[in-house]
Amino acid sequence: MIRINSRGLTVSTRRFQTLSKIGSTLKTKEDIRNALNSPVWSLKELISSNEKDMKSVEVSAKTINKVLKLSAFDTNITAEQEKSLVSALSAQMVFIKHLYENDEKSDSVVEENDTHFRLIASDHNPGEPLTLKQLLAQIEELPEKVDPAKGETQGSFNVANMNPRNRPFATIRSKQG
């Protein structure tokens, strides 16, 4: 609460605190370890995907092979492993589809989100490495570089002018008075 009186502005605050107990009290390290290691929810409970939803998503062996290659995993898998991966990827795609379909605020369709979610090999190509000479040249050019986007102007800051004795360090003093 803020009050204005003859002595000026008075500010007073009140503190509100509420406590409630959730679950049993954890007394030992073993109790804490067990509580942290036990799952409290799963995607299967949140979204029950039926066979109709799973069949609406088409995942081929070619897609699984491509995902494995992009992930740098071994592509030599058994038919059982492939079936398991197809099932897992289908469930994930049904989950993502569920998120988009139930988003009432968004009028966009799933295909319009390609700008946000993309996997292009060129995104992961590193640039050319710098040589020592190039790095030293960049360091030498640094004092002359001015970035107007940061509000810098040419000659706006010079460390040598801050110290009247022109020593290679700066001394900052507060204003007297």
Curated annotation (Swiss-Prot):
GO MF annotation terms: ATP binding; glutaminyl-tRNA synthase (glutamine-hydrolyzing) activity
EC number assigned by the record: 6.3.5.-
Topology versus the membrane: Peripheral membrane protein
Top-rank EC class of the record's enzyme: ligase
UniProt keyword list: ATP-binding, Ligase, Membrane, Mitochondrion, Mitochondrion inner membrane, Nucleotide-binding, Protein biosynthesis, Transit peptide
Transmembrane segments: none
Gene Ontology biological-process annotations: glutaminyl-tRNAGln biosynthesis via transamidation; mitochondrial translation
Residue ranges the record marks as coiled coil: none
Biased composition (Polar residues): 153-164
Subunit architecture: Subunit of the heterotrimeric GatFAB amidotransferase (AdT) complex, composed of A, B and F subunits.
Entry's family note: Belongs to the GatF family.
The protein's name: Glutamyl-tRNA(Gln) amidotransferase subunit F, mitochondrial
Taxonomy of the source species: Eukaryota, Fungi, Dikarya, Ascomycota, Saccharomycotina
Gene that encodes the chain: GTF1
